[in-house]
Amino acid sequence: RQSSNFFYLTGINNPSMLLIITKISSRHSTTLVCDRPNDIDKIWHGQLPSKSFYKNEFEIQNVLYSDELNSLELNDAKNMYFEFADENRLNQFIENLNLSQPQSRYLRNNTSRSTKIDLSNILFDMRRIKSKSEVSLIRHAAKISANAHVNIMKSCKSGLKEYEVEADFIKHCMSERCEQAYPAIVASGKNACVLHYTKNNSTLRSNSLLLVDAAAEYDNYASDITRTIPISGKFNEFQKKIYEIVLKAQTMAIKACKPGKTLIDIHNVAVKYITKGLIEAKILTGKLERNIKEE
């Protein structure tokens, strides 16, 4: 999968690329470094895009092939911003670019003399504010995910394997040109108590519950949905009571999502209501504050 930061800055999904943004006084320029197309790559992967394609399609000012990297003047840079400033990770990153030895040496030499600054937090702050088009992509991914969840709710039954449910979910997403946002958790019965259960190989049993944490990703924008459903198609009274506690907590947490609120503020709203509900259901004992503190 493409680096989210690289995709955010370029919109490009192709691998083995380097984006260099330079600023001299008030002037700045962008340079994309990519592999030179060759006949072997064409046989294995198809025709690679040309320089003009990247310039025109993605509005990149300059495009260099990796064997032309030393034509780019980097040795006067006082500060260099990387997605990571750790020396070992930087060296590993350069190695993963599959450059020739002279080009790798050139890049290492010209980065070693500069002050390295971690760019990731700056990019995270930028990415936190979504444009209308980004919100639209996320909504689309969420809609596909929701439909896939509804689909498996309808087809779920005793005797199926967890991986069959997962396959059904993936099939629906792929039919809508979506990938998986993360490895699916499809956990029936006690498996749902394992926070990151990924074996997905148990058999679904009547009167048990099935937890599905799975979601679609569309054009590198992800959704994230978790739902718990009755395998038999209907909750018993106890299951229904717990479900309603969780549903109400979710509704209250969503209402708490307002400007100025932090994630921990919203988390605490849900925790307080769930804890209160579990005490009333006699699953937890003791005072509300004490249970929350020990959570």
Predicted regions, residues:
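Active-site neighborhoods and metal-handling regions in enzymes and metal-associated proteins
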Residues: R1-E295
